[in-house]
Design a protein with these regions (language model features):
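C-terminal motif of bacterial Sec signal peptides marking the signal peptidase cleavage site
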Residues: 14-18
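Solvent-exposed, low-complexity, repeat-rich "mucin-like" stalks and linkers
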Residues: 36-67
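Surface-exposed binding patches on compact interaction domains or structured appendages
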Residues: 62-91
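Cys-dependent protein tyrosine phosphatase-like superfamily
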Residues: 22-25, 127-400, 414-511
Length: 511
């Protein structure tokens, strides 16, 4: 009995000792938890010139880190590193800012449990959007080089409109090979637009306030264009070929920033008036503005005269019932700068607008549903109204822009009539007519034709539709006479236009 008691007494202290190990006392000096830190030791905000450049940001990091620019226009090196007590240097680089406005982004420095941002702002490019520079003494091409190649290489004989067309031999339009419904908005070569050039001046010569451009030519045209405060250049376009221009840019105080003269070459006076530019997924799309516009001037007649420039223009719509409108505010100013004073709208009931696209223009909209011979015969009274509006506008010294929706069928019909009456050779009228091939969707081919024209291909050559409908009609009226005589006979006997209006039109248009 005593032995059992003694054994129990020996075991109890051991149990107490073992139980004590299950609940140890806390360590009086534990290791402190390390906080993740990135400490920027240099600049936290950087400014870069518009030309591009680089900079270096320095920091320390007690964790592995990455450096990531928030936009693709900025690159960094190195892009990652290990934790270190020593300072780290990361270099960032960017190219020239392609836009007029400043652009800003961040370089994100991050590691497990920590993130810091460093801002980078690049100045806007004052030369963004500047066309190729034209200087005193330069000689430049006025119209599109694509159109120039076609006009200088192709010759059509009279009365051969049923034989062939050569326009598909030239890049720049819907030939069924190069452009599709899907890629035209990004790949369109803009062959219907004239060449643009920029007049530039030195930054150190500038003064605060708006500036102005005075531009004039040897033909007697002149215009003044306001230039925004701080601008370093002004773009000019819609130049007449084979002309001499004088330019001068002045400040509000009258100080001359730059001046000079240049000459132009080319075959046709193309025009473009600005509209709002559209983008898709950051890509600039083609087709904006008032398109398919060209002057009827410059063509030679059979009796050795020349059609005057800046009198009558043909083109696509200047306004419409839906947005975006062809012309923006800048485009409206460009119409007036060109000197256009009257608008003839040939559209039908579905899309005609009975008011001018630009405030102050004289306006006429007779409502014509279809071009071709139908327009000439069934709508002879309205064709007469169109002709009289053109003549009366010219009498008042107001150049006319006439258009339908695309500037193709009804516009083409009236263009054939006007050029034919002036005595331009029919084969040359065919070349002028086919220039619509170089215009984008909505002008050369209709966007509503996707199902019937899936390739797509331009279907309004001289062999088809309007041209092959109107021209033989005028030739038939001419009998053994000239094409001009056939057109005049139509105006006198069918449209009932007065001989006085015909004579005045020729006198006003020819030199």
């Amino acid at each position: 009995m005593n032995k059992k008691i003694w054994a129990l007494m020996l075991v109890l202290p051991l149990c107490v000792f073992c139980g004590g190990k299950d609940n140890p006392e806390p360590d009086p000096d534990p290791d402190p938890e390390v906080k993740a830190e990135i400490v920027i030791s240099g600049e936290k905000e950087f400014d870069v010139a518009y030309e591009g450049g680089s900079g270096t940001l320095t920091f320390t990091s007690n964790v592995d880190w990455t450096a990531t620019p928030d936009d693709a226009w900025l690159t960094v090196t190195p892009a990652s590193g290990k934790a270190s007590k020593s300072p780290v240097a990361v270099k960032f680089t960017c190219g020239e800012n392609p836009k007029l406005k400043n652009r800003s982004t961040y370089i994100v420095l991050s590691g497990t449990g920590v993130e810091k941002n460093v801002s980078v702002t690049q100045a806007g490019n004052p030369m963004a959007g500047a066309a190729a520079e034209v200087k005193d003494g330069d000689k430049v091409l006025a119209n599109s080089p694509l159109v120039e190649k076609f006009l200088t290489e192709v010759t059509y004989a009279d009365k051969t409109y049923k034989e062939d067309t050569k326009v598909f031999d030239y890049y720049g339009g819907f030939d069924g090979k190069n452009l599709t419904w899907d890629n035209w908005e990004t790949d369109w070569p803009d062959g219907d637009k004239p060449e643009s050039y920029s007049i530039r001046w030195k930054k150190e010569d500038m003064e605060s306030g708006k500036m102005s451009l005075q531009l004039s030519d040897e033909l007697g045209w002149s215009g003044t264009l306001e230039i925004a405060d701080g601008a370093r250049y002004v773009n000019i376009t819609n130049l007449v070929p084979n002309d001499k221009y004088t330019f001068k840019v002045t400040t509000a105080s009258g100080k001359v920033l730059t001046q000079g003269q240049f000459t132009t070459t080319g075959s046709i006076h193309q025009c473009f008036f600005s509209g709002d530019i559209k983008t898709k997924s950051g890509v600039t799309l083609k087709g904006e503005g008032a398109r398919n516009c060209r002057d009827l001037g410059g063509w030679k007649t059979l009796d050795g005269k020349t059609v005057k420039y800046r009198m009558v223009y043909r083109g696509g719509r200047l306004n419409e019932k839906w947005t975006p409108y062809p012309l923006n505010e800048q485009g409206q100013k460009e119409v007036l700068f060109e000197g256009i004073g009257a608008q003839l709208d040939l559209r039908g009931n579905s899309d005609v607008i009975h008011e001018p696209a630009v405030a102050g223009l004289d306006h006429c909209s007779p409502v014509i549903e279809q071009g071709g011979k139908t327009m000439l015969v069934n709508d002879a009274a309205k064709t007469k109204e169109c002709f009289e509006f053109v003549v009366n506008s010219l009498r008042k010294g107001k150049p006319v822009h006439f258009h339908c929706s695309l500037g193709r069928d009804r516009t083409g019909t009236l263009s054939i009539l006007l050029m034919g009456l002036l005595g331009v050779r029919e084969g040359d009228i065919a070349k002028e007519y086919e220039l619509t091939y170089f215009a984008p969707v909505g002008y050369s081919v209709s966007s509503s034709d996707k199902k019937s024209n899936p390739t797509p291909i331009f279907k309004n050559t001289r062999k088809e539709w309007v041209y092959s409908d109107v021209v033989p009609y005028f030739w038939e009226l001419a009998g053994d006479g000239t094409f001009a005589e056939g057109v005049e006979k139509y105006l006198l006997t069918v449209a009932k236009v007065s001989q006085q209006d015909i004579d005045d039109f020729r006198n006003l248009m020819l030199e």
